[in-house]
Structure formats: structure tokens, C-alpha cells
């Protein structure tokens, strides 16, 4: 499975679930029957891959973390229109809550329900996703497909976080 991941370099995480969630399917087509838990173990126990936004939410080899640093430094572009001073303060408070109280999913953090946009995400979910897109939070694990966020410092080894990022053009070439 690791060789397949190394060849593909990213696997889109998808909630589509006809037979199994779509991100398990590339391995069936390449490896034949396999234990689906293997991908989850590589992501959440062994940290061979991690979750981050590439074009979509993806599993990416941890060895490629520095290739996405430029994206995390600027965050996702769709966040910028939501950054009022009030929102910035709330986003910071959500990060601090996770830092102080430990891993959390959106439903465990109080916040207003969302509007029709952003899949009706709560304000807490938007804040968690904002911090995740900027690399301050990482996905520690998933429960019933829901992300459990923790501060990146507790999810990844320090040398991963300290590795300098690539320039955007260089990262794209890789």
C-alpha cells in the first residue's frame, strides 16, 4: 500500500459511499482485496500520510508536507472573504480551545449554526477548517468520517513542521 501511495502521491478523500468511500477504491483497483483499515492506520496511527487541502481534501505522503507549506501559509483563498475582525478573534479562540482542551470535532465546540453556504457549516466548523487550511490544526483521526482536529504540534513530529516549505513554483514542479 505504501508503494501505491508513493506512486500516486495524493488520494482524494471523498464522502461518496456506494460500496465504500471513494478514497478506498484506488487501492482495490491496484492491489485487489485489501484490509480497508490499512489506509486509516497509515493516516492516523503511523502518520505515513496526512490530510490537507490540495485541490480537494486529500491524503498526501507526510514526506511531501513541505510541498504544501506555501498553500498553508496563505490558507485557502475562499477563507479571505470571511475574515472580519470579529471572525478573526473567534477563529483564534477556537484554536486556543483545541490547544488547551485537546482534540475536538466541530460539534464539540459551541458556535452558531451556519447559513446555507459552506454546506451549512457551523461557525465552529468554519473556524476549525480555517485553522486546518493554514496548517495550525491537523486531523488527528476521524470518527464516522467526521474530522477530529488537534494542533499540528501534537499530531506531527517537530522536524516535519520545521522543514522549510518550497517556493510555490518549485512545489508545483514536484
Model-identified regions with their sequence ranges:
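Long, low-complexity intrinsically disordered regions
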Residues: 1-174
Amino acid at each position: 500500500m505504501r508503494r501505491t501511495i508513493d506512486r500516486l502521491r495524493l488520494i482524494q478523500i471523498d464522502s461518496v459511499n456506494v460500496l465504500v468511500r471513494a478514497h478506498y477504491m484506488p487501492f482495490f483497483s491496484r492491489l485487489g482485496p485489501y484490509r480497508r483499515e490499512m489506509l486509516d492506520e497509515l493516516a492516523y496511527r503511523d502518520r505515513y500520510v496526512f490530510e490537507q487541502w490540495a485541490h480537494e481534501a486529500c491524503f498526501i505522503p507526510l514526506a511531501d508536507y513541505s510541498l504544501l507549506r506555501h498553500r498553508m501559509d496563505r490558507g485557502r483563498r475562499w477563507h479571505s472573504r470571511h475574515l472580519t475582525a470579529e471572525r478573526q478573534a473567534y477563529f483564534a479562540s477556537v484554536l486556543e480551545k483545541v490547544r488547551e482542551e485537546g482534540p475536538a470535532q466541530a460539534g464539540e465546540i459551541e458556535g452558531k449554526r451556519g447559513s446555507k453556504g459552506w454546506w451549512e457549516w457551523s461557525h465552529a466548523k468554519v473556524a476549525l477548517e480555517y485553522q486546518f487550511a493554514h496548517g495550525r490544526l491537523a486531523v488527528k483521526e476521524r470518527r464516522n468520517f467526521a474530522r477530529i482536529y488537534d494542533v499540528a504540534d501534537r499530531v506531527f513530529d517537530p522536524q516535519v513542521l520545521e522543514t522549510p516549505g518550497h517556493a510555490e513554483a518549485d512545489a508545483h514542479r514536484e
